Swiss-Prot record:
Belongs to the class-III pyridoxal-phosphate-dependent aminotransferase family. HemL subfamily. Pfam families: Aminotran_3. Gene3D superfamilies: Aspartate Aminotransferase, domain 1 (3.90.1150.10), Type I PLP-dependent aspartate aminotransferase-like (Major domain) (3.40.640.10). Its main location: cytoplasm. It is found in: Cytoplasm. InterPro entries: 4pyrrol_synth_GluAld_NH2Trfase, Aminotrans_3, Aminotrans_3_PPA_site, PyrdxlP-dep_Trfase, PyrdxlP-dep_Trfase_major, PyrdxlP-dep_Trfase_small. This is Glutamate-1-semialdehyde 2,1-aminomutase. Disulfide bonds: none annotated. Pathway: Porphyrin-containing compound metabolism; protoporphyrin-IX biosynthesis; 5-aminolevulinate from L-glutamyl-tRNA(Glu): step 2/2. The gene is hemL. Its cofactor is pyridoxal 5'-phosphate. Homodimer. Its EC number is 5.4.3.8.
Length: 431
């Protein structure tokens, strides 16, 4: 990794930490991050020319794999007509129609430029719509870096939240309640204490930022019931799960209808795009139809919209999501079987084409506390072994993995063979 090491050293001169998003710095696992030069199908290629089987997939959106030729050509064609207009286009109307067709709960939607913009705007809308200030989120869920969301639980279950980053005033954090994921009783208790104050619940319907943790039976329905009872807005943050765990997202997989949904770069074919949308009567409160302000010069960018249309029209292919789910199950269960056979405690979670590997003897990880108690030393050793042998996983034990349509059965089996070799080394070191 000689060239990557040189680039990383050079990057730290003018880029804080040498990266433009913290997890890329490899602080959680140690070592030097490979600097990527190109990507194609299931593969990444670093600056030193090494090929990796990629299970990060740009943190989720590359459902079709990298450098999809139809998306690439759509971008080229759109770019020939100009890169940005700052004006309405037919493409943004067409993609809004298509998203609404595929995710029926999104009766109206607004394009933005990132998942953070989507969640930030959805929360502002929920507050404006309900005329309430408090929001409820869950420990271990990540919804972007907006001030109101970088908040952790206080000293007691129902105490005011406290900032999880410097630069966030305590006055902002006090309006955020943080509950335990998959614990509906804590949510009910919060609403009983603040029945007229909570504007919304925001939740990852499948948590993807404490590794991959699906909802336990009844959890999402419980959130729907509580919001209905107290007049709060239920927001599904489907930035990771949208068009990933099912064609209609997690809400289709689990048959729960939220009031608002947030989507990320998956609807831009991997380009910088986001969207939020939902019930018509709520969305009509957004400017210029209503009083809740939201805007963006680059929102609905014509090149990104072209990429998104090319992507969404392909993921409609019958059978795609069944194939993705089967490949993901084969991979996750295969790695678990190898680990357990070598005497390494491991459990796995998966939902659609998202998966999580947990070095723990807990049979099924369902919350943040269980996730953070996993064996990070074993994970880090496993991570570097896989990386050295050409498999690129997320460089932190708290991040989900993703399978794409380009991960063929042969590539899955190749990955399992590499995992067997690496896990044998883990067993030897920690046995």
């Amino acid at each position: 990794m000689q060239k990557s090491e040189q680039l990383f050293a050079r990057a730290q001169k003018h880029i804080p930490g040498g990266v433009n998003s913290p997890v890329r710095a490899f602080r959680a696992v140690g070592g030097t991050p490979p600097f990527i030069e190109k990507a194609d199908g299931p593969y990444l290629y670093d600056a030193d020319g090494k090929q990796y089987i990629d299970y990060v997939q740009s943190w989720g959106p590359m459902v079709l794999g990298h450098n999809n030729p139809i998306i690439r050509q759509a971008v080229i064609d759109a770019a020939q007509n100009g890169l940005s207009f700052g004006a309405p286009t037919e493409a943004e109307v067409t993609i809004a129609d298509l998203v609404s067709e595929l995710v029926p709960s999104m009766e109206m939607l607004r394009m933005v430029n990132s998942g953070t913009e989507a969640t930030m705007s959805a929360i502002r809308l929920a507050r404006g719509y309900t005329k309430r200030d408090k929001i409820l989120k869950f420990e271990g869920c990540y919804h972007g870096h907006a001030d109101a969301l970088l908040v952790k639980a206080g000293s007691g279950a129902l105490t005011f939240g406290v900032p999880s980053s410097p630069g966030i005033p305590a006055d902002f954090a006090k309006h955020t309640l943080t509950m335990e994921y998959n614990n509906i009783d804590s949510v009910v208790q919060a609403f009983e204490q603040y029945p007229d104050d909570i504007a919304c619940i925001i939740v990852e319907p499948v948590a993807g930022n404490m590794n991959c943790i699906p909802p336990v039976h009844g959890f999402l329905q419980g959130l729907r019931d509580v919001c209905d009872k107290y007049g709060a807005v239920l927001i599904f943050d489907e930035v990771m799960t949208g068009f990933r765990v099912a064609l209609g997202g997690a809400q289709a997989k689990y048959n729960i209808v939220p009031d608002l949904t947030c989507l990320g770069k998956v609807i831009g074919g991997g380009m910088p795009v986001g969207a939020f949308g939902g019930k018509r009567d709520i969305m009509q409160h957004i400017a210029p139809s209503g009083p809740v302000y939201q805007a963006g010069t680059l929102s609905g960018n014509p090149v990104a919209m072209a990429a998104g249309l090319a992507a969404l029209n392909q993921v409609k292919r019958p059978g795609l999501y069944e194939e993705l789910s089967e490949a993901t199950k084969t991979l996750a269960e295969g790695i678990k079987a190898i680990a357990n056979g070598l005497g390494i405690p491991m459990s796995v979670n998966y939902a659609g084409s998202m998966f999580g590997l947990f070095f723990t003897d807990v049979e099924c990880v369902t919350n943040y506390q269980q996730a953070i108690n996993c064996n990070t030393e074993q994970f880090n050793h496993f991570y570097h072994g896989m990386l050295e042998n050409g498999v690129y996983l997320a460089p932190a034990s708290y991040e989900a993995g993703f399978v794409s349509a380009q991960h063929s059965p042969e590539i899955i089996q190749q990955t399992l063979q590499i995992a067997e070799k690496v896990l044998a080394d883990v067993a030897k070191k920690f046995g």
